Amino acid sequence: MAHTFKEAARFRDLLWFLITLGIYQSGVSTVVVLAAIYAQEVIGFDTQSLIILIMVVNVTAAVGAFVCGHLQDRMGSVPTLAITLVIWIIAVLAALFATMSLDMWIAGNMIGLAMGASQAVGRALVSKFSPSERAGEFLGLWGLVNRLSAILGPLSYGLINYLSNGNHRTSLLSTLAFFIVGLLLLSKVNESRGKAAAISSGALMDDAG
């Protein structure tokens, strides 16, 4: 795995995107793990309402993934992901200031749209930035970053929740920060340059062969 990281470091935009992915995906993982608890303990959702919300969010996630595909074709993956992260930020802000069930329904469906889109576009970008002969290796890094984020995000939320005496709204600020920082880091990723580097490396490998 260390060798794979060393190889990935040769591709500036791939490495920068993996760092970006690790940050914003920490926010995504936190929402996936703790959204239900937030809805119940902060907004007062009962079990039945929560189940219905989760079912609807799954539908909006599918819609988000579908729309994401069309946006990537028209705009590119990086602009599409930027839009997705803005939606995440707005959704988390909506949840942060939610005071009634309707607020959480709005936030939840925005989360669904963003979740479906961000999962799809993240993998697509790693594929674009990976030389064909190393695609499997670098997609393995993508998976590793996702797994690490699944630990970092909820852990940060839990730590702040503990330090704030169980204040979920304060804890949610860490989740919001992940998306804001992720969006800022994404501005350093150049999709055209990253694709060109992957293609160029592949051509060099072919010539060497």
Residue ranges and their predicted role:
Residues 1-19, 204-209:
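Juxtamembrane intracellular "pre-TM" segments in multi-pass secondary transporters
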Residues 33-49:
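Short amphipathic helix-loop junctions that connect adjacent transmembrane helices
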Residues 159-179:
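A membrane-interface helix-boundary motif in multi-pass transporters
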Residues 173-206:
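Multi-pass alpha-helical transporter architecture, strongest
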Residues 96-108:
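Helix-loop junctions at membrane interfaces in 12-TM secondary transporters
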Residues 79-94:
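Structural signature of the two symmetry-related core transmembrane helices
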